Amino acid sequence: MAARSWQDELAQQAEEGSARLRELLSVGLGFLRTELGLDLGLEPKRYPSWVILVGTGALGLLLLFLLGYGWAAACAGARKKRRSPPRKREEVTPPTPAPEDPAQLKNLRSEEQKKKNRKKLPEKPKPNGRTVEIPEDEVVRTPRSITAKQPPETDKKNEKSKKNKKKSKSDAKAVQNSSRHDGKEVDEGAWETKISHREKRQQRKRDKVLTDSGSLDSTIPGIENTITVTTEQLTTASFPVGSKKNKGDSHLNVQVSNFKSGKGDSTLQVSSGLNENITVNGGGWSEKSVKLSSQLSAGEEKWNSVPPASAGKRKTEQSAWTQDPGDTNANGKDWGRNWSDRSIFSGIGSTAEPVSQSTTSDYQWDGSRNQPHIDDEWSGLNGLSSADPSSDWNAPAEEWGNWVDEDRASLLKSQEPISNDQKDSDDDKEKGEGALPTGKSKKKKKKKKKQGEDNSITQDTEDLEKDTREELPVNTSKARPKQEKACSLKTMSTSDPVEVLIKNSQPIKTLPPAISAEPSVTLSKGDSDKSSSQVPPMLQDTDKPKSNAKQNSVPPSQTKSETNWESPKQIKKKKKARRET
């Protein structure tokens, strides 16, 4: 009974297992049919249970066998890979080329020939038309000898660098250079900036120039603290007078300008040569020579900065200096000047004879107005149109001639005739006042007519001034008050030039001693007598009622001139404010 029960239990378990296997097989076959479209024609329900069990057991064994075989193959492959490099070396080394094989001998010879061709030196001259045969030992030994000679050369170079640079790292560099037989130095380590002897000399010269400039400032008492220039408006003034070029005095050939800049960035260089440059932050400024005419500026400096440009030749410069202001046929007016600098009122107040006092004074005002522009021609941009642009000549920056003495002499001369002219003008006024009540009614009518003509002339000049101010470029905006001043003086000069000179004489006395004024256009007693003697009698008669009419028309012109004379004070205040900022 017990044995049967044991067999029955096995049978029941086998049937249960087979039923599960059948279900799995049916599911797998259905999956193959639906997904892959494979129909194996197997029906697990038809087969008995023992067949299914045997089949599944066999499949399990196959799977185990395949897994074990794959694992063994993988392990064997890994072992082969680990042992493969030494085996390959052993296999490569034993088959050394035997001298008996002809193919291997040919290959070896061809390789040796290639090596020889690479190592061959350039052919030496052929003795008697035959090439020199170089043995193989020499060909092989030459690069070795070169490599053996290279290390001592590098050691010598390193020793020199030790002496010059005195570095502790030079030993390490010597080891590196000796280890490398290429013959090339390695660019490593800290680089040092060396200053050449030439640069040191230049620096010493600059320092000497700076120290000399301080001593020159102390030696020249009249030039100290005359010019204050900011870094924004760097200009220096040279004051040439006359055409003399004497170089006797060292004080006269050295130009010193004292700078008071708020920023303190400007450095001063004073040289005794023909050219002088002021370097500010590395930039060079060429100087512009400025003439100060007592008729135009009336004691006010006119500073203009000019950008560096190629200047004109000396021929134009000499012609500019030697030209007379009263020469009507000279070329001074047509030198490519801007329209802002041209004389606009050259014909007003002039008659057919150019001998009368009014015409000469008019033209002298025009000449004095044009004179600063003559300096522009040979020192600035405007000279490019007339001069040769390819010339290397630069404008001289220093004063020519004994300008200090001439300056003082001209001031003394100008003050003496001005005092005489004041007396003459006072006498003329008294005579005119005495003649006014004693004159007849006809003379009064003539005076009124001429007074109206003078007023119309002044109105025309004012209209022309307004038109020209509108047409002038923006660059001349700073010089407008000075132009108005000159124009007002011009209208006064057509009637009576003596009073103009009296007005101009007042600011001349307040000028600093370092600024040289041109010889002012003055009419002394002797000159006035000569000019009056040369004038025909008709012109002299016409001049007397003009002077009488001038006294009637003085108040409007004087009020205009007073308003114009107030403007320079405002301009000076503005300039002081700019310099302080």
From Swiss-Prot:
Stretches the record annotates as Disordered:
77-221, 280-581
Q: Where is this region: Lung-homing for mammary tumors?
A: 380-442
Q: Where are the residues of the annotated region Interaction with RELA?
A: 100-204
Q: Does the keyword Lyase apply?
A: no
**Tissue expression from the record:** Widely expressed, with highest levels in liver, kidney, prostate and small intestine. Not detected in endothelial cells.
N6-acetyllysine, modified sites: 263
GO molecular function annotation = double-stranded RNA binding; NF-kappaB binding; RNA polymerase II-specific DNA-binding transcription factor binding; transcription coactivator activity; transcription coregulator activity
Q: Give the GO terms filed under biological process for this record.
A: bicellular tight junction assembly; lipopolysaccharide-mediated signaling pathway; negative regulation of apoptotic process; negative regulation of transcription by RNA polymerase II; positive regulation of angiogenesis; positive regulation of autophagy; positive regulation of canonical NF-kappaB signal transduction; positive regulation of NF-kappaB transcription factor activity
Q: Which residues lie on this side of the membrane: Lumenal?
A: 1-49
Annotated region Interaction with BCCIP: the residues are 72-168
- Keywords for this protein: Acetylation, Cell junction, Cytoplasm, Endoplasmic reticulum, Membrane, Nucleus, Phosphoprotein, Tight junction, Transmembrane, Transmembrane helix
The task this protein performs is described as:
Down-regulates SLC1A2/EAAT2 promoter activity when expressed ectopically. Activates the nuclear factor kappa-B (NF-kappa-B) transcription factor. Promotes anchorage-independent growth of immortalized melanocytes and astrocytes which is a key component in tumor cell expansion. Promotes lung metastasis and also has an effect on bone and brain metastasis, possibly by enhancing the seeding of tumor cells to the target organ endothelium. Induces chemoresistance.
| Name this polypeptide is given | Protein LYRIC
Quick one: which gene encodes this? Answer: Mtdh
